Regions:
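Charged helix-capping and loop-helix junction motifs
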Residues: 85-94, 138
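Serine-esterase "nucleophile elbow" of acetyl-processing enzymes
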Residues: 1-46, 56-65, 181
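Conserved, well-ordered alpha-helix/loop/beta-strand core segments that scaffold catalytic motifs
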Residues: 70-72, 108-112
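A short helix->loop->beta-strand "cap" motif at the edges of active sites that frequently abuts
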Residues: 99-108
Length: 197
């Protein structure tokens, strides 16, 4: 079964080994459940916003249909102060693309929420409360559009807000492989359901 992962630094696994990326860990978890999932094909880059992911997909369009497609995008829209309604429109278009890559089956698409970077060391000296509120607002948009489309919503934001030793990478911003393992754990149920549709 083919798995396509679309996103930004969180999907490419900035500052972690390739085996620590959450899509890779998710594929391993699905294989452990006897689901014959291949390694994920990843279209993602650190710093990408919704429009940049769209351009990235256009530059290297995936071929054929996928049995599972994941989407996680929006933190850089929030970080750069982009308009939330612009995010809605661009997210909706990306979600439609994801459904297209899944052979037109929204039930084969999983969307992960945006994690809260406001709790990290990188956010010291910034308004952590505002960052968290902005992330929540963007996620409310993502969740409503995802559910309206009939895709699966996976909320990793609460996990990103947990205070565990070793929860972030050495850069003090991006998640560690351990946190990504938790995300994969949270996504297993939705991904399993998606693959059985």
């Amino acid at each position: 079964m083919r798995f396509l992962a679309l996103g930004d630094s969180y999907t490419i696994g900035e500052k972690v080994d390739s085996t620590g990326r959450w899509p890779v860990q998710l594929a391993n978890a699905l294989r452990a459940k006897k689901l014959n999932v291949g390694d994920p094909e990843i279209i993602a880059r650190t710093g990408w916003t919704t429009d940049e992911l769209k351009a990235g997909i256009a530059a290297t369009p995936p071929s054929g249909h996928f049995d599972l497609v994941s989407l996680l995008i929006g933190v850089n829209n929030q970080y750069r102060g982009r308009d939330a309604e612009q995010y809605r429109a661009e997210f909706k278009a990306l979600l439609a693309q994801a459904v297209g890559f899944a052979g037109g089956k929204a039930s084969r698409v999983i969307v992960l929420s945006i994690p809260d970077w406001g709790v990290t060391r990188y956010a010291e000296g910034r308004d952590r409360g505002k960052i968290g509120a902005d992330i929540d607002h963007f996620n409310s948009i993502g969740r409503s559009e995802t559910l309206a489309a009939g895709a699966h919503w996976v909320d990793v934001t609460p996990a990103s807000r947990e205070a565990h030793s070793g929860w972030t990478a050495p850069d003090g911003l991006h998640p560690s492989a351990a946190q990504y393992a938790r995300w994969a754990e949270l996504a297993v149920s939705a991904a399993t359901a998606a693959l059985k549709k």
